Amino acid sequence: MDTQAFKRSLHHSERYNRRGFGRANEVASNLEKAYQSSLIGSIRDNGYVLQHGRLQVKLAEAFGFCWGVERAVAMAYETRRHYPSERIWITNEIIHNPSVNEHLREMDVLFIHAEGGVKDFSCVSDGDVVILPAFGATVQEMELLHERGCHIIDTTCPWVSKVWHTVEKHKKQEFTSIIHGKVKHEETLATSSFAGTYLVVLDLDEAQLVADYILGQGDRAAFMKRFAKACSANFDPDQDLQRLGVANQTTMLKSETEEIGRLFERTMLRKYGPIELNKHFLSFNTICDATEERQQAMFSLVDEPLDLLVVIGGFNSSNTTHLQEIAISRGIRSFHIDTPERIGDNNSIQHKPLGEDLFIESNFLPAGSVNVGITSGASTPDRVVEHVIQKLIDLTSD
């Protein structure tokens, strides 16, 4: 499929909207009530520090809603205001935050059912309104909805769209897209649908396996077994790893994406030499500014003298998970929670250790003075962070 031609056609359709409805003022009070926090504003004004009795809270200097998330949520609210009685569907969670998605359900926004990773669009009819979430949607989903006569409201983050443009450039120039991301993540699924030939690598270890194969150090059968579900149809590592372009899922760890880019540049330089390098390697900066800011703020926060760190965000949120990884890399006691209700009145916390199931830890707050660092993923409202802080205040108010 010529994805660029399809997008041009879709963008000119009267049933496609990616700019909202000019109703920002009408929904502003609803958004403020649901997601903003005067307490968080006060803490920001106080140097990101709150002192309350024996509790000191230190906030990261960049956390919570990014502008892409704010835009997507606002557009969803505007959509319901603009279509007060129509059936409205959304192809996935608008963002990875349970409270925000629950608010949409309360507004009678319907979620497309998926089973085994396959979405069932049979429920969607001609004239229905369908919201595409901040992560985007695959080009095949867009085509299906367009052909079905739906009103498409596209809240895809512009940073995600930028990555789509990048992999389309790779395709046009007959380069294979190496996508640093999680194979089953909605954003990576969408990005790969706009690519031609592609291979998804999760981390630096997987990237090294690919680099080794390029340099003749791998076994084809083992390689294909490892990446069978992470590559385009009919992928041939002997042919398709000769010309590479690097892109990424925008919420991945910035430092790792950069290292993967440098790894493949060195690999292609070693194989083809400096004169031929540009014929075999392309690199574009597809790292989201907001992701980078939150990760840098986290690196600063973990340099503070902290007793523990609370990371707030959906358990399926990639950018939140990477914030947790930063805390772990510094050896700081850290707890990833998705809602304030994970903190119990008995000083227990139900959290998700990295790569593990939920776990309840008792007496997680120590006696005496306690310094708690707090950050949150790009899909977490300030109001949720406020409620977490209030829980900590209640537990330390002896």
From Swiss-Prot:
GO molecular function, one term: 4-hydroxy-3-methylbut-2-enyl diphosphate reductase activity
Cofactor binding: number and manner: Binds 1 [4Fe-4S] cluster per subunit.
Cofactor requirements of the protein: [4Fe-4S] cluster
Bridged cysteine pairs (disulfide): none
UniProt entry tagged with the keyword 4Fe-4S: yes
EC number: 1.17.7.4
Binding-site residues for isopentenyl diphosphate, renumbered to this chain: H96, H185, S317, S318, N319, S379
Keyword tags: 4Fe-4S, Iron, Iron-sulfur, Isoprene biosynthesis, Metal-binding, Oxidoreductase
Active site (UniProt): E187 (proton donor)
Annotated [4Fe-4S] cluster binding sites: C66, C157, C288
Example GO biological process: isopentenyl diphosphate biosynthetic process, methylerythritol 4-phosphate pathway
InterPro entries referenced in this protein's UniProt entry, alphabetically: LytB/IspH
Swiss-Prot/TrEMBL catalytic activity: isopentenyl diphosphate + 2 oxidized [2Fe-2S]-[ferredoxin] + H2O = (2E)-4-hydroxy-3-methylbut-2-enyl diphosphate + 2 reduced [2Fe-2S]-[ferredoxin] + 2 H(+); dimethylallyl diphosphate + 2 oxidized [2Fe-2S]-[ferredoxin] + H2O = (2E)-4-hydroxy-3-methylbut-2-enyl diphosphate + 2 reduced [2Fe-2S]-[ferredoxin] + 2 H(+)
Gene3D superfamilies, alphabetized: 3.40.50.11270, 4-hydroxy-3-methylbut-2-enyl diphosphate reductase, catalytic domain
Pathway(s) served: Isoprenoid biosynthesis; dimethylallyl diphosphate biosynthesis; dimethylallyl diphosphate from (2E)-4-hydroxy-3-methylbutenyl diphosphate: step 1/1; Isoprenoid biosynthesis; isopentenyl diphosphate biosynthesis via DXP pathway; isopentenyl diphosphate from 1-deoxy-D-xylulose 5-phosphate: step 6/6
Binding site for (2E)-4-hydroxy-3-methylbut-2-enyl diphosphate: H96, H185, T250, S317, S318, N319, S379
Keyword Iron: yes
Annotated residues for binding of dimethylallyl diphosphate: H96, H185, S317, S318, N319, S379
Pfam families in the cross-refs: LYTB
UniProt record similarity statement: Belongs to the IspH family.
Function: Catalyzes the conversion of 1-hydroxy-2-methyl-2-(E)-butenyl 4-diphosphate (HMBPP) into a mixture of isopentenyl diphosphate (IPP) and dimethylallyl diphosphate (DMAPP). Acts in the terminal step of the DOXP/MEP pathway for isoprenoid precursor biosynthesis.
Name of this chain's protein: 4-hydroxy-3-methylbut-2-enyl diphosphate reductase
